[in-house]
From Swiss-Prot:
Subcellular location: Plastid, Chloroplast
Predominant location: plastid
Keywords from the named record: Chloroplast, Plastid
Listed GO biological process terms: protein transport
InterPro entries the UniProt entry points to: Tic22-like (IPR007378)
Gene3D superfamilies from the UniProt entry: 3.40.1350.100
Similarity annotation: Belongs to the ycf80 family.
Gene Ontology CC terms, in alphabetical order: chloroplast
Protein name per UniProt: Uncharacterized protein ycf80
Pfam families: Tic22
Amino acid sequence: MYCSQAITQTSRLPVSNNFYCKKTFFSSVNSNYQNLSQMQSWSSLKVLAFGLPDLHSIPVNLNNSFQEAIVISTINDNNIFADVTNSWIKMHKDKNHYSLFYKEIFKALLTKQIHVIDSPIGSKDIDNKIILIQQYIWKKGLKSPQFNSIARLNKNVDISNISTKFIMEQLSTSPVFVVKNGLNEIILGHPLSRIRRTAFNQIASSLSNLFHQPIATSPISNGLFFFHPDDAIEFKNFVQSKAPEACKDMDIKIQPVGLHVAYKMNRNFSSDIQFRFVPDFKEVGDLIFRHQQAKNLHFHENQYYGKNFFQGQPIYMIQPIIIKHRNGRISIIKFTGANDDREVVFTNLEAANKSWANFIKRTPYLKRLKKPNLLVYNLESFLKDKEVLHKADLTKFIVVTNKSAYITTKESVTLPYHNGLSKHLELNVKPKLFFVKLWIRRLLFTLTYE
């Protein structure tokens, strides 16, 4: 394939030492495809192939404001770019030019700076010469928020929606785990490109957050919610191994939070932060390599899985049992919890089997069914399916996680919330006191340092 570029700019600027056969500045990026005869007649036409212009003579702030239109087309003798591309290759045999271009393209793809601005790739008839072409926009610098399209681009799930409010109520009794510091802040994972990003990108991100409009100027940072405490501990140990002094200084620890809190944060997006569920790794491994072929497991039709992979956090739902009595009467036995008729969603196969064993003790004619029929799905998709339901179709459910999660949660709650004051002290006052203590310690260290 050939790759050619047309740089767009609002004013004419001198460009020296560039790689172009001919050159011009189009007034708009939408000047996508020009008639072949017109292109050949324009002496100012600029077409680039396999190279980038040398823009060192242009001030940095102007250089960063560039955006390029990239046209990708198939190799064809009738291709309008073929001749100029071949001529450019012959003129510039230095492979550094070639590699530089693709290095920049690859970097832009990774940081999501290249976007399609035309319909999917198709044929274009230019002077009866059919070629396959597709145009993209390469954003090279600061991108300001488009204030007139905030509602269209806001990808947040409306937490005030009836279905999402209902879901949060059902998730409130289930624990997950995060790694926090003494300021009650979740530890985030940042890509290297974000740590090194420029002041312009920092400003763009801040503006995007202000107007709730996500922009893809760099890979997002991730906050993690763990279903099993052992996985959270492993992540904490990894962070401590990378920065032991900082972790000690910042009082890094794991802490249980309600699954409803994790769900709310997972379904809200900022410009560069996203919160993700981390499945129980042991549970996923056991399901894939030990239990996948079990006859009592039936996978949901929308579940994505294979011999060595499974999408999301596994959940198990005990399916109703059809019983035919001796008198010909048919009964449908639905599994329920001990105290109510809520649908029970298990994130652990062992918990599902034990609950079934307790259930059949209360139903003697089911004792011959040693194992329940289980529908296997993933929690993320299960919740998304619930989000689109109408109020009349919503049914109560409860998520039962692994035994270790409840034990760890019980051990972690050292300050019982008997009243609103205790909760306020734990969540608001304690982090502020830690902040003061931290900076006093740092100030004393600075004053005593020789």
